[in-house]
């Protein structure tokens, strides 16, 4: 089960995995930041989040002081394996005024589904979020969730990964881009339903209304 994940070759996979293990040793540096976003330490460790503390591997120099978000993929006959990572700026500033996006993706990466390891176990339903941290919050409270790296990142061939699910719930942001994402996914996935959010995205909803707010949003499409 693979999408456009990079890299494929063994040497580069091992390099990324070694880097992730290094960055994960600095997790304590960002626990307060993650907690402020609703992510528990247990969840952070489960997803192997890390931080680049002035020790980037070659090629990661531009991501110093970023949160590292490993992309883990299921492997037949073994545990899920880290194959790539994205980065999130951890500095308390307006990223736009500093001429860089909040989330950074290595050059040449065409985009991948986050947390495909969640799809390794047979289930009747799956939840799709707009953003990695949103999917972590849903998983934190018992919903199997994956994420797209942006509202416009859907790729047609991903459809095959979701064919076995009876129910798919789309948690896109409540804005025009999020609405377009929901429409795109509902066209591609007939069994998909859009979960309406009003407060903000999944993280905003959770921070303001807790799990109850998320449950109430989901209940509106389950009734």
Regions found by a protein language model. Name each.
Residues 53-166, 181-182:
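Phosphate-handling DNA/RNA-contact segment within nucleic-acid enzymes
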Residues 1-68, 72-74, 117-123, 188, ...:
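TOPRIM metal-binding catalytic domain and adjacent DNA-binding surface shared by DnaG-type primases
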Residues 165-179:
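A structural-propensity feature for long, helix-poor, extended segments
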Residues 39, 143, 190, 201:
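Short phosphate-binding/catalytic loops that engage adenosine nucleotides
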Residues 196-197, 207-223:
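Metal-dependent DNA phosphodiester-chemistry modules and their immediately adjacent helices/loops
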Residues 180-190:
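Short, aromatic/basic amphipathic alpha-helical patches
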Residues 149-154, 173-176, 197-200:
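Short, acidic/turn-prone active-site loops that include or flank metal/cofactor-
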